[in-house]
Amino acid sequence: MRELKHELLPTRHTQVFHEDKDKMEFNAPHHFVVVPAGSPLVDQQIHYGRGGNSKKVTVKDFAGKLATVNFQLGPVTEHGANGVMNEDLIAMVITRLQYFQNSEFNCRENAMAITKLEEALMWLNKRTAEREQRGVEGTHEK
């Protein structure tokens, strides 16, 4: 696995990893692991997929893993719901920030983050609606 690096992602407390490019399917990473910063690596076998479609993939797992996120792999119409959607994670973060906003921890920065995350959901929903209109949603067609 490789570490997710982004100039705006702090790594003081946690680090995020995803599968190597040669293990990716459908042009994007689908499997993420969040660990405490500086966690030692451990080899482990993990099964990805469902039933007869599952395949054994060697990945790097981590001692003290905090979370694993497996995104939808392939179109739902072809593969069924088998993972988290981008929109699901964005909605989770919005909900968490809204709870902070309804407490003594409210602040302008959280309000701005909520607005921008809601905007991100709007753009993703717009893309889906346009793909549905063209009859290509749930396929690998543009």
UniProtKB/Swiss-Prot annotation:
For this UniProt record, the keywords arranged alphabetically read as follows: Host-virus interaction, Inhibition of host innate immune response by virus, Nucleotide-binding, Viral immunoevasion
Residues that coordinate or bind 3'cADPR: 72, 74, 96, 100, 105, 110, 127, 131, 138
Q: Name one Pfam family in it.
A: Acb2_Tad1_hairpin
Biological process according to GO = symbiont-mediated suppression of host innate immune response
Q: What InterPro entries does this protein map onto?
A: Acb2/Tad1_hairpin
Q: What happens when the gene is disrupted?
A: Knockdown decreases phage infectivity about 100-fold.
Record's function text = Blocks activity of the Thoeris antiviral defense system (ThsA and ThsB, AC J8G6Z1, J8G8J6) when expressed in B.subtilis normally susceptible to SBSphiJ group phages. When added to phage SBSphiJ (which does not naturally encode this gene) confers resistance to Thoeris. Inhibits Thoeris upstream of ThsA. Probably acts by binding and sequestering cyclic ADP-D-ribose signal molecules produced upon viral infection (3'cADPR or 2'cADPR); sequestration prevents the signal from activating the ThsA of the Thoeris antiviral defense system.
Further facts: Although 2'cADPR has been crystallized with Tad1 (AC P0DW58) we have chosen to show 3'cADPR binding here, as evidence suggests 3'cADPR is produced by ThsB2 (AC J8CSK2) and 3'cADPR activates ThsA better than 2'cADPR (AC J8G6Z1).
Into which family does the record put it?
Belongs to the Tad1 family.
The record describes its quaternary structure and partners as: Homodimer.
What is this protein's name? Thoeris anti-defense 1
Q: Which organism is it from?
A: Bacillus phage SBSphiJ7
What broad taxonomic lineage does this protein's source fall under? Viruses, Duplodnaviria, Heunggongvirae, Uroviricota, Caudoviricetes
